[in-house]
Amino acid sequence: MASFVDEVLIRVSSGRGGNGCVAFRREKYVPRGGPAGGDGGRGGDVVFQVRRNMRTLVHLRYGRVFRAKNGQDGEGARRFGAKGHDCVIPLPPGCLLRDAQTHEVLHDFGHAHEGCVTLLSGGRGGWGNYHFRGPVQQAPQRAHSGQPGQERVVHVELRIVADVGFVGLPNAGKSSLLNFFTHARSRVAPYPFTTRIPYLGVLRTGDGRDVILADVPGILERASQGVGLGLRFLKHLTRCAGLAFLIDLADERALHTYDLLCKELYAFSPVFETKARVLVGTKLDLPNARECLQQLRAQHPSTEVCGVSVHNRWGLDELQEAFVRLSDAGAGALRSPVWRNQAPSFMYAQLEDPVCQVRDDFGATVSLSRKRKVRG
């Protein structure tokens, strides 16, 4: 089975700013060159970048400490130190960043066109002694230390971004439908929980459009309380533009399956109540399936109901059109309830977090009494 990691804890820290330099201008025929100490370079930032070709967080499982480079110290002749290299952490689309201590939402990559975000800024470089020159103090022998970097423990949670998410009991035909439309090679077998991790596939329509389909493991009764695979994979459906409820028409519980699935989804998150949906009756080629499909349509007259058979290729064209309509219903919407309800205020709240507070020694001066080398 392919490795699928959707949650991981990582420690990130930005770079420290370089120290300012104590130096003086020493040139021929310039007896009083004055101070010429350069400023320290700024520390590197911690940047999270979305990459569309990634689907899991397995690359963060074994390397969980990420540090940006420190800024270089200033030098003589007013030469500034180089900025430290940024630490760029690649992420798949749909990730949610939380503070591991306060559980504050730091950033939510639920937006469809989001690229990268700077989570921690590097420390500022210290001033060289050139900044302390004046008519009274013409040869200052002090410089500022660089600002220390910031550090945080971040909980990274992946929530798959898709246009249509498949919801159903085990063995409802979700994987077979995904394989037919997208050639995703999801495993199919006649026993429950054949699908144990989410699978994504791209449905390419005749007019050149792409519709992303997501298949998650089957949902059991009381799944919102931890039964079966429980809550672990229900979160991946929160970002889907629409939901396809797959109902096995040969199951004796078929007429009650939709209510059961809705109950579990609503108990997990109220965001599911407003999502566009379509009911898909599967295994239409089995006995008594058509009668069950008619009863299902009578029970839910306000919801679109489709009947399909992957084995006989029945009703698949109509279902493809329904998937396109679901994708259009959520087009342009921000598929993240966390981002809508919570403003991205972490950039302004950093100094209030004890982890990110500036230390007391920032701005301290360094004199020659500390045996600091003077550069000419």
From Swiss-Prot:
Matching InterPro entries: G_OBG (IPR031167), GTP-bd (IPR006073), GTP-bd_Obg/CgtA (IPR014100), GTP1_OBG_dom (IPR006169), GTP1_OBG_dom_sf (IPR036726), OBG_GTPase (IPR045086), P-loop_NTPase (IPR027417)
PROSITE patterns, A to Z: G_OBG, OBG
Subcellular location field: Cytoplasm
Protein's name in the database: GTPase Obg
EC number: 3.6.5.-
Cofactor dependence: Mg(2+)
Signal peptide: none
Main location per the UniProt record: cytoplasm
Any one GO molecular function term: GTPase activity
Pfam family, one: MMR_HSR1
UniProt binding sites for Mg(2+): S175, T195
A GO term from the CC aspect: cytoplasm
Quaternary structure and interacting proteins, as annotated: Monomer.
Organism: Treponema pallidum (strain Nichols)
Family stated for the protein in its record: Belongs to the TRAFAC class OBG-HflX-like GTPase superfamily. OBG GTPase family.
